[in-house]
Amino acid sequence: MAQLKILHQRLGVNIDHVATLRNARGGTHPDPLRAAMLIAEGGGEGVTAHLREDRRHITDYDIERLKAECPLPLNFEMAATDEMLAIARRVRPHAACLVPEKRAERTTESGLDVVRVEDALRPIVDGLAAIDCRVSLFIDPEPAQLAAAKRLGAPVVELHTGTYCETAESARAAELARLQRAATFATDLGIECHAGHGLDFATTGPVAGIPEIVELNIGHFLIGEAIFSGFVPTITRMRHLMDEARAPLATASRQ
């Protein structure tokens, strides 16, 4: 079996909650585009924004501005609907991540059940691929979900790390192992593996140390921490934490 090549791990930052803070009072401040510029300055390599059906935080105009003016690739989080596909066709983001969406939820509560909605997802996945948009599916780290993603032809999956982050520290090793197995299976299937949801300074290192995971997407924690420490220092600290977690992998791969 060929040795796994250890790839640089990208940091994508979700800026939804910059818009949440703006919308709490109305107006234009704080501006998600300005946040995206600071993310680039701090070492982030992508910006994620979720345009929800109810437009509770990010707006259509935000998506248009981010695509037109942000120096980083835009990862457009979207429900698998005809409306969102039409917006993606108009805006042409670098990537689109399909996520489940419920009006009553505060945040995304689980991964997309690709097994159950595989047929409904197919025209959305194909439509995004037709505009050269990199498609990812936000899924729980389960073999059946990965197999369904492969059948759909999705080139990327993002593993839902929420259960790992919310589990008591004494039981977290089992959830980390579950993520590792899923990442290995994804790679064996030829699917690029990302991860995210609920990660913070305490929980990111072990996930960043999974060799097959080449991108982490982190949002709420970084936006909250930036209120106290500033955007650039917060992003830079997370970037360094990820690099430290990957360093032993790179060293081992050279030996």
Give the location of each predicted region.
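C-terminal helical cap(s) of enzyme catalytic domains, especially alpha/beta-barrels
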Residues: 67, 110, 171-172, 225-248
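Hydrophobic faces of well-ordered beta-strands that scaffold small-molecule active sites
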Residues: 9-15, 47-49, 74-78, 96-98, ...
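Conserved N-terminal beta1-alpha1 strand-loop-helix module at the mouth
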Residues: 1-77, 81-93, 148-151, 174
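Histidine/lysine/aspartate-rich catalytic loop segments that bind and position anionic ligands
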Residues: 134-189
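Glycine-rich phosphate-binding active-site loops on the catalytic face of alpha/beta enzymes
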Residues: 97-105, 156-168, 212-231
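Active-site mouth loops of central-metabolism enzymes
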Residues: 14-32, 73-80, 107-115, 129-141, ...
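N-terminal active-site wall of soluble small-molecule enzyme domains
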Residues: 51-127, 145, 159-162, 179-185
